[in-house]
Amino acid sequence: MNQLYSFFKNCNSFGAPPPLYTHVFLGSRPGKFYLSASSDNEFYTLYNSLVEAKTPVCVAEKQDDYVPLLGDVDLKVCIDQENAFLKKTRVLYGEEELRAIVKCFQDTIKKNVVDWRDYHLICVALEKKPYMAGEYLKNGFHLHFPYLYLEKEKVKNVIIPKIKEMVAAFRLGSGKRLFADIDDAPENFIDDVTNKCWLMYGSSKSEDKKPYRISQVYSGNLEPMDLYEAFSIKPFYTKEEEPITVTVDNVKKILPQLLSISSIKKEVLNVKTPMDLKIPTKIYLKQELKDIEGENSETIKRNLKDAKDLLKILNKKRANEYNSWWDIGIILFNIGHGCEDAFTIWDKWSSYSDKYDPDACVQVWNSMHLRNPRFSKIKGMGSLRWYVKQDNLKGYTAWVDKMHGLVLDEKNLVECVTRLEIMTTDTPLARLMLDLYSGEYVFSDAGWYSFNGTIWSPVKVLKDFRVKFEHISTKYKEMRKRIMELIYHKNDDSGRDSEEDSQEEEVSSSQEQLSAKHRAILMAKYRDINRAINKLENFATQNGILKMCEVFFYNEDFSDLLDENPLLIAFKNGVFDFETLTFRKGLQSDYLSKTLNIRYDDTLTDDSEEVLELYNFLSKIFPDEKVRAYFVDQICEVFRGGNRDKIAMFWTGNGNNGKSVTQRLFETMIGKKLAVKLSTSVLTERIQPGQPNPQLTRLRGGIRWGVFDEWGKTEQILSGSLNVLTGGDSLPCRDLFQKGSDSSDFTPMFKLLCICNELPCLKDAVDATWDRIRIIPFESKFVAREKCPETEQEQREKKLFLCDTEITQKDRMESLARALGWYLVKIFKEKEKKRRNGTYQVTIPDKVNDAKLKYQAKCDILAFFMEETYLKTDNQDHKIPFDDMYISFKNWYINSFSGKMVTLNKHEFIEMVRNKYNLTETDKALRGYMWNRNYDDSDDE
């Protein structure tokens, strides 16, 4: 088994992306592997020898779009006192039931498959001994029709349901239903295996289980057949389309090949449909490749020619690395619009790899059109040029210089100069700059940007461009010198000996005419070069070239795409992709312009010094382990854009409990470009579409951390504004002095955080609002040494810790921030994997829920008013008219909230009172309450 596993590891092709695999390892060493056609023979030689030696193997094949008809009859029964006989006999079916199931399959084929022949009905039955699995006795068998291949979707949606109907209606000779002693619905035992991997012959699901073995081969008439007789009717083929030799002597040994579910060179039948299905050969797999056609065909051909030249300069080692190999493929796919010429270029370049597999290239190419067009189409010539520049800048520059006539052919210098086009105007010079810096610079509505290898950074001065102008000028000066040498050389050689014969004079005359023509052309080129040099070295004319560069480098979608991908976040040294959960180099197509303030250090571990210091810090901030775990579980979402859980987090405590230090740690990690502190007015005032709101404008551009701090005692949060900021919907965005027509909406990507000692009142909150709120209590207290308990155990019990006055030093904060970034990514990856496989569950700690319940009670404005203004007596003779209550409520509200006017009218207030105290429409007063005279006294004071 280890030998087979190592074989797959060694031959596993780079050409198969993670979703593309052909075989699955089960048992103690699970995994998915891709087996290329070229490794097919070597694999079966090894596999057959292991099966023949009865070595436990656990390998299954992935089913293709075209599959043989397979049957899996899985019988099991719980063993108790009533059916103890079964435990003793260990028999759940007999030969009669087996033959009956085969007949149901064959009858279904006859009724639903088009143009079937007798050999299509040949069925291989595979069985193994019954076994106990806990309280259950399990037994069953597999069926395999080696000559009958059908479209998988039609097997799933047509054949299997028909078989189940046939099994349900079938009656044995005694009149009993199939498996009547086990279940009244025998069709339930027929499993649909079209979406499952199929065990190879000789393999089992785990090392401790026995494999299924051939017990019988049935003909179309249910007559037993010899193995050689059954497998010699039609030829079988390897994945390389070579015929397999079947003899009486070797038929048992090569059963794993004969019972493979590979569809190569198999005859595929239709299921009651006139549509003709083609045999899936390699040629068939290539049928989707398109020819170059359409209005842009000339542009496509030109780009493909350039791409072919650039691939000659590109480092061939990239063909061995999957990500860059796939990127080059998608680049060529986009350049060539998926045409066959583009594929041919990619296929040839892929052959530089030692792991080259033409089958994988075809399959991956055909899958590329399934990619998200928003992100795949933006990889084109610019991305290819970037790759080449990274690998061979000198070679790329030489290629561009040659394209634009900056390199002379010394072997045929005169002809080369005469054909030379000197760039004396803005347009060709701008095109040259585009070829040199495409993918590295871009001009957008927001100005110039340059790509630094990780992000796009704004550029104020195009210094590189002006330096390049000087470089081109130097090239032209060298050409001017060579032209002068040619002209003077011709003049020196123009004389002829007067004594030459007439034939030589005739030849000399024609050479002088040709030389004169060349001299005229050379002089014209000389003047053009002088004009080009003057243009390239003059500041004013350089500006004209740069203006034309703005036209060629302009990308109208750049500003809209910038920082709009919520699944990408840039560290200082690369990009983390939350779709693939991997850290990688930045790409131009990431369209990121901001980085976190830290580097991602994947060398850190749980035992690293800075990570241990972080764990110690968090354990003091949150002594309660459940609160700490919940805090980290929620806060790890900070890097992923958006607020998919729709949570508003409140950090609260009485002071000196670490809120500010924790916030500073997060600001150090995230950085000023991706974290902003906002005015509390954003939450206390209604967000008005169309009105200028500079605070909201600050949240654009992929901001990940929005903090509301320094709350006033009388400020109230509007639940509507809170819902808008946490709902994930687009927000109106208009800056000061910006025209309404220039404003635009944006989708927020930040996590909302409120930091306060006392929670501000939440106004008009509904259940949906409360569902979003998470109150994180900061319970610790950081005190001076004289107030701090001596032992660590006592400190944690009392939640009193020594105040570390040095923790906010820059180097300490940066070290903790780097560890925090690594830790949050680690937690997010673990959490996301659970989300994707459906096992993620979050438990909100009781302390967090209790804090929210207390907050809800505080925000009940009517309860707050009644508590301060009235006394509950439970005496029904005591009553307060609604009119008097409303007058008192208005006065109380103005005094309690710094002169703010009441937003409830009288009718709304009375309705709120009736709903809270379950009163009817006929009630005009609230009974059981009386005026609190202490409230009057406090007002007088």
UniProtKB/Swiss-Prot annotation:
Coiled coil: 285-323
Record EC number: 3.6.4.-
Domain of life, source organism: Viruses
Region spans: Disordered: 492-514
Binding site for ATP: 653-660
Acidic residues composition bias: residue spans: 498-507
Annotated InterPro entries: AEP_C962R, Helicase_SF3_DNA-vir, P-loop_NTPase, Phage/plasmid_primase_P4_C, PriCT_2, Viral_Helicase-Primase_Cplx
Database matches in PROSITE patterns: SF3_HELICASE_1 (PS51206)
Domain SF3 helicase, residue spans: 609-791
Annotated keywords: ATP-binding, Coiled coil, Helicase, Hydrolase, Nucleotide-binding
GO molecular function: ATP binding; helicase activity; hydrolase activity, acting on acid anhydrides
Family according to the record: Belongs to the IIV-6 184L family.
Protein name as catalogued: Putative helicase 121R
Species, as recorded: Invertebrate iridescent virus 3
